[in-house]
Every structure is written in C-alpha cells, then in structure tokens.
Amino acid sequence: MHTQSFFSAAEEVMKRTIDRLKCELSSIRTGRVNSAAIETIKVESYGSIMPINQIASISVSDARTIEIRPWDVSQLSAIEKAILKADIGMSPANDGKLIRVSVPHLTQERRKEIAKSIGKMAEEFRVAIRNERRVLVENIKKLEKDKVITEDDKKKLEVEAQKVTDGYIKKIDDSIVVKEKEVMQV
C-alpha cells in the first residue's frame, strides 16, 4: 500500500527533526560546564570553516573551565577569535599551547533569557513537525482523489497521521521541559 511509504518517509523526517532538536539543545549552556557548548563553534582553519572539535581536543578541566588543545598550535588565535565571535558569554585565555575558556556562573536573568530562547526553538521544531504532517495529509488526500483509497481509509489515515504528529510533538515538549529545568537549576 502506498500509504505505508508516505508514513515511513514522514516519520523519518520527524525523527531527524527530533535529532536536530537534541543536538541544538545539547549546545545550550546550563549551569553545569559542558564542552558541547563550544564543540560546534565554527573556526576558519586551513582555508575552510570547521567546528572546533575537528581541529582540537576539548576537555572539561574543572567546574568552571574548558580546555581546548589544538592539534596544530598555529590555530590557537583562530579558535580564540571564533569563541569571542560566537558571543556565548565565555572568555577564552590563550597561553600559547592551549586555550582555557572560563565559564561564568549564569545570572537568574540570563537563565530566564536562555529558557525563553529554548521555548522559541521548541516552537520552530513543532512547526517543522506540523509541516511534515501537512505534507503527509496532502499525500493521503491525493490518494483518495486518485481513487487509490476510500474516503473512510482517508479519514483513518488522517487520524493516524495526527497520532504520529502528536507523539513527536510530545517528544519535543518532553525534551524542552528537561532542558528548561537544567537551565533554571542553580
């Protein structure tokens, strides 16, 4: 049946959307030091743009410090500039061999700003999921119009499409609640 391939394709897109959300959420800074916040910062290196984690090793040295050890020390200044340019509220210190990034405590005001931006991000991902549902429903309607399925089948499939969509929206909401709690935790 054609509908199964439509559902499979839609679910695959929805799964990738959830994966992207989780990736973006992991890069958001919480009260705890996490190297993921800087791993994906783009650095101009060797004539191309690369994430920091592809040109250096990144480790958390203590509760408030991340160390970046480039594999080529000539990249130190490029990495330092990229961190400053990213404007993520962290200050890099270059000692000639590695970069130490001091992670300041988040103020309550900054925590609220981050939580608000997480909410906006969540809505963008919900819209992406709903758009995929819309495409799925349009395909179902086209099958009915082409007399491949009956009107009853169409209605059942539309209900199923809504259930799938609701499941993925719930995954977004659950992920957001967890991340907002992490951010607001002092």
UniProtKB/Swiss-Prot annotation:
Signal peptide: none annotated. Gene3D superfamilies: 3.30.1360.40, Ribosome-recycling factor. GO terms for molecular function: ribosomal large subunit binding. InterPro entries: Ribosome_recyc_fac, Ribosome_recyc_fac_dom, RRF_sf. SUPFAM superfamilies: Ribosome recycling factor, RRF (SSF55194). Pfam families: RRF. Responsible for the release of ribosomes from messenger RNA at the termination of protein biosynthesis. May increase the efficiency of translation by recycling ribosomes from one round of translation to another. This is Ribosome-recycling factor. It comes from Endomicrobium trichonymphae.
